[in-house]
Amino acid sequence: MWHRALGPGWKLLLALALTSLQGARGAEEEPSSDGSFQVVTFKWHHVQDPYIIALWILVASLAKIVFHLSHKVTSIVPESALLIVLGLVLGGIVWAADHIASFTLTPTLFFFYLLPPIVLDAGYFMPNRLFFGNLGTILLYAVIGTIWNAATTGLSLYGVFLSGLMGELKIGLLDFLLFGSLIAAVDPVAVLAVFEEVHVNEVLFIIVFGESLLNDAVTVVLYNVFESFVTLGGDAVTGVDCVKGIVSFFVVSLGGTLVGVIFAFLLSLVTRFTKHVRIIEPGFVFVISYLSYLTSEMLSLSSILAITFCGICCQKYVKANISEQSATTVRYTMKMLASGAETIIFMFLGISAVNPDIWTWNTAFVLLTLVFISVYRAIGVVLQTWILNRYRMVQLETIDQVVMSYGGLRGAVAYALVVLLDEKKVKEKNLFVSTTLIVVFFTVIFQGLTIKPLVQWLKVKRSEHREPKLNEKLHGRAFDHILSAIEDISGQIGHNYLRDKWSNFDRKFLSKVLMRRSAQKSRDRILNVFHELNLKDAISYVAEGERRGSLAFIRSPSTDNMVNVDFNTPRPSTVEASVSYFLRENVSAVCLDMQSLEQRRRSIRDTEDMVTHHTLQQYLYKPRQEYKHLYSRHELTPNEDEKQDKEIFHRTMRKRLESFKSAKLGINQNKKAAKLYKRERAQKRRNSSIPNGKLPMENLAHNYTIKEKDLELSEHEEATNYEEISGGIEFLASVTQDVASDSGAGIDNPVFSPDEDLDPSILSRVPPWLSPGETVVPSQRARVQIPNSPSNFRRLTPFRLSNKSVDSFLQADGHEEQLQPAAPESTHM
């Protein structure tokens, strides 16, 4: 199976090797000297580099497909380990074909092209609250823990070397400390690759992953300091140089963070003004973020910290400013680049190892390095956790400490740093490279294989991938305010106090500068919750009737149609429905001309088609159709779903505001609606050409359109957009013939429109399929008991602290029910 599965990859690699040989042999060949015209010429040297890059990307992508063909393999072996093994196999094939290590993971390729998309993806999708809530813990592990691991590993190896167990090596104390500094850092790429498959709880994951990101500053400083000391020589190092090394740590870390924040501010500001160039919005996100990385490298600062904090700080404002299509493009492109870069890194780690020229073996040095990095990692975690648990509210248990100690994975960062060493200054560079590769393979393959069974055996709390309920959000928000108030009253400055102050500062200053005004309104918490409740209630209101079988009764817009609903007719059984559905699916001819269908003699199926057609046309939004738009490089087709959501929201908001106003001022909406209905009816009699001045009552349907003139919009663009949605037509409750109309105003659905005041005798009809305990279905009960509009639903009422509270809204509604006349009244807004 594996031979067949890897066949395409081997064929591509063999073709790559053969073409490389042919290109090497024929690169210097002169063109034909006979002077004749050649129809086809072979120019391998002309496309060699991009062709090889494309082939390697294709091989890496095919490898991911092959690995995931068998879920059993990927559930046991991490994908990073499989990629390293694949790299070893491919590297062996390339070496056997050419005996030259043609393809290796170079530091330039890694640091400038493969690492930035991975770190940007991690920063842009970082859970900010979880990250900053554990920032103190992360910084302690990243700074103190990395220094501890580097110093103890280097000094321990130097002590063993002095004992003579390693034999004769041309290494000094500074060389051992240099090696300890590059091998001590936890690699973010390896941690992401392994821990995302384990699915540990969020706190444990953010601590280990945050440590792997933030220890870059410590690693870079230690590496540069000890490399400079090795260049100067141990005798030339003074105390001033040590002080400069300590100062450089703060400059590198804080400087890289500041560069990232500045570019995040610039990116957020740019995306605020991209309303008319939506198509290039994703380009700004990637280019400006990458510039933050390059700028930090240019200034010798921490580039990983720069691009990480650029993604962390800009995500809130960028997501609010850019369009939905651009946000989707950014999300998928960023994930694609990060996944592809991670795949190439691990595969090239395996390929780079197949090079006999870099291998120098020393058993004592290699084995003791593995022992020391594991032991000192565990000791450092235990000591630091003991200190942290004295101040943390949620303490880290022993099981969490075991996983953190075992999760100290090394990866391509250590390999790239060791390859950068100058062989003239570090005599045993090949020994360091060989040991680093062994450490990377051991941590990624062995620890990656065993960490998942270890987590299951220790019963570590796993992450829950679900959306928190509204009740959980409400209580979490309330607890945040309570804890912030307690800290404020007691005079203590804690996480909740700082978070509350930052939220106020962001709302008053940053959001006004970096975010569009329309985005500020749309991000309002109350309106977001209101919008979610509105959509949920609308969906459940319709679905409730469908489950009960009373959808036709609920959606019937006129009195006559409601009278014509025969509840005594038995409903078809499940078998009949399935047979009917089967026959309908296999019918070849379907009549789509609804006008001719209505005029001719109708069968049962034709009647059903006609009713379904009119129901969908009148009460639901138009389904998506394939429009043929002209090609444009600068514009995208607007998403109709956004208009639908906005229209539902604004229409329901207006009805609830009117309900609130009427309840507060004691205005009887029925009397007001009766006057409006009489005035409209008189106007219709005067203007209509219908004989005797009477309106026909057959097939009546209420058509509603609305123009939101009174809606206060802050910007011209919002008013323009909304006029496009609503159609800009004055609202009139009119009675027209039941024709297949296509109103540009949006929905004309009684579910979202005001209820019709109907004859009580009609509303009192009870469907026969209900049990004695249920007089009417819940959705029908909502129509009958509440006379005015859906805004009187208990869940759709204006915001209250409790469903059980008896406020002015319920009292006003109950008073109106008592005063409602028996005669039906007009439809009103």
Curated annotation (Swiss-Prot):
Phenotype caused by lack of the gene: Deficient mice have diarrhea associated with proximal tubular acidosis and hypotension. Males are infertile.
Molecular function via GO: identical protein binding; PDZ domain binding; phosphatidylinositol binding; sodium:proton antiporter activity
Domain of life of the organism encoding this protein: Eukaryota
GO (cellular component) term, any one: brush border membrane
Gene3D superfamilies (UniProt xref): 6.10.140.1330
Disulfide-bond pairs as recorded: none
Interaction with EZR as annotated region, ranges: 571-585
Cytoplasmic side: 70-77, 125-127, 199-200, 275-276, 319-325, 385-397, 463-829
Renumbered residue ranges of the record's region Interaction with NHERF4: 586-663
Compartments, as annotated in UniProt: Apical cell membrane; Cell membrane; Recycling endosome membrane; Early endosome membrane
Entry coiled-coil feature ranges: none
Alphabetical list of SUPFAM superfamilies matching this protein: Probable bacterial effector-binding domain
Stored InterPro entries: Cation/H_exchanger_CPA1 (IPR018422), Cation/H_exchanger_TM (IPR006153), Na/H_exchanger_3/5 (IPR018410), NaH_exchanger (IPR004709), Reg_factor_effector_dom_sf (IPR011256)
Name of the protein in its database record: Sodium/hydrogen exchanger 3
Biological source species: Mus musculus
Gene designation: Slc9a3
